[in-house]
Amino acid sequence: MTSKLEQLKQFTTVVADTGDLDAITRLKPVDATTNPSLLLKAAAIPGYADLLKQVKADAKGDVDLACDKFAVAVGSGILKVIPGRISTEVDARLSFDEPALLNKARQLIALYEAAGVPKDRVLIKLASTWEGIRAAEKLEKEGIQTNLTLLFSFAQAQACADAGVFLISPFVGRIYDWYKKSTGKDYVGAEDPGVQSVTRIYNYYKANGYNTVVMGASFRNIGQIEQLAGCDRLTISPELLQQLSDDQGELPQVLKPGNAGEAKQPLNESQFRWAMNEDAMGTEKLAEGIRQFARDQEKLEKLMAEKA
């Protein structure tokens, strides 16, 4: 019997949610994703010490540029050991500023291209705010493909699909966390609200012929991953990838394109904002996620300033 990880790879593109090059080399994902929190962890890995020094020297005291160069350097290194793409995130503090998001995305792509990485191997990650979705729509038309993250609500998924973004990252574990805390209940299998959210989005996209890739993210256990086997892509931490690799049990495909989904429902800005307002979980987790990524970005900047 092959491992659950190898079985999963038969019908889902497996992505590593980490900046740890050793883990990526060992687990052989197709793609990899990073974010400010993961870059902060990567900065503490001894193997990145020389890279940190080099990045700071190149940035010549510009802390913002040093952070961008570090993200691109980590991403470029990862691309040497994976066949697919790297997702690199825009500063979360820009999440409500469309022009600033556009500028930062273009800067990151320019840094990648200067490092010899073509833009078709990079996905720019943006928070799934209204402004982030609008920025992504423009970037896609420029040939810069995007990954819309911190996606917790169906309204966010609807708006992303209508904007023609390349990929979305609907979160599973953080939705599970919210409902567990809110209700005091534990959720397993198909009853998990995070699993239900991604399943609903996947079925809606397939039923309506959207090309946007659905990449489930933020997992708490392999049970959640198993329930989403068949999703276009799943981005998984090294710890859970290792658990899947060590498990020889059977892993059947659950999500399939032929499953029934809801009819297409385009949203304008006021409808989007109202739908978000009505979704307490989606509103709270989006705001919390942006705050957390912003804090970690600030910590990364502090690290860059200290070592300069």
UniProtKB/Swiss-Prot annotation:
Known pathway: Carbohydrate degradation; pentose phosphate pathway; D-glyceraldehyde 3-phosphate and beta-D-fructose 6-phosphate from D-ribose 5-phosphate and D-xylulose 5-phosphate (non-oxidative stage): step 2/3
Active site positions, chain numbering: K125 (schiff-base intermediate with substrate)
Domain of life: Bacteria
Catalysed reactions listed for this entry: D-sedoheptulose 7-phosphate + D-glyceraldehyde 3-phosphate = D-erythrose 4-phosphate + beta-D-fructose 6-phosphate
Molecular function as annotated in GO: transaldolase activity
Principal EC category: transferase
GO biological process: carbohydrate metabolic process; pentose-phosphate shunt
Keywords: Cytoplasm, Pentose shunt, Schiff base, Transferase
UniProt xrefs under Pfam families: TAL_FSA (PF00923)
Entry function: Transaldolase is important for the balance of metabolites in the pentose-phosphate pathway.
Classification via HAMAP family: Transaldolase_1
Subunit structure: Homodimer.
Annotated protein name in UniProt: Transaldolase
Organism, as annotated: Pseudomonas putida (strain GB-1)
